[in-house]
Amino acid sequence: MFYDTDVWPQLDNESLWIYDKLILSRKLGYKCGPCGVPVPYAADYIVRPIINLEGQGKGTEKLWIEHDTWHLKFGYFWQEIFAGRHLSIDYHKGSQLRCTEGFREQKSFVHFTRWILVDEKPKLPLIVQDITTQYDDVNIEMIGGNVIELHLRKNKDFDDGAIEVIPVWEDRQNSKPENFFYVEDTDDERPRLGLYKRYE
């Protein structure tokens, strides 16, 4: 399966928390809370939907919050901000398949400019490690070594052996890079037209 919208209807009730980013964050010990729960101190926080099956960071914002959070949208939550590299790791039946690093536009949580294959095996919290052995395919998103999302499907963009991928967005202009091949890859979940791919 390639889409979270396909996975959700088949999940058992005990596993639904995997797609609940607030519960996941709480289980991992992050500073977080739903709309209405005050923040522990005044700072910038990441605010995003508790559940977002469409993915790609949609609805995510960085907001300065003094204390109260009643002004946030219902169904959203706040969480401490993590800095560092953005990694996407695929597992199949408990074994790591690949690890990729993503680079996005500085002011956007949606538009990634490229993804590259990296030779790394990030250490996972035990609760997340257990998930990788319970399902055939698991994709894990991390920032600065902190797990931020779980998906019970894989990242299909690198299945064909690509080592670098550049998304082509419908609202961005891309010129074809040298030594890359264009692959049309439109879908209903993301506003992208295709991918430029580079192979060894």
Q: Which residues are covered by each model-predicted region?
A:
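Active-site nucleotide/adenylate-binding loops and adjacent lid/helix of ATP-dependent enzymes
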Residues: 2-126
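ATP-dependent carboxylate activation and anion-phosphoryl transfer catalytic cores
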Residues: 56, 105-111, 115-200
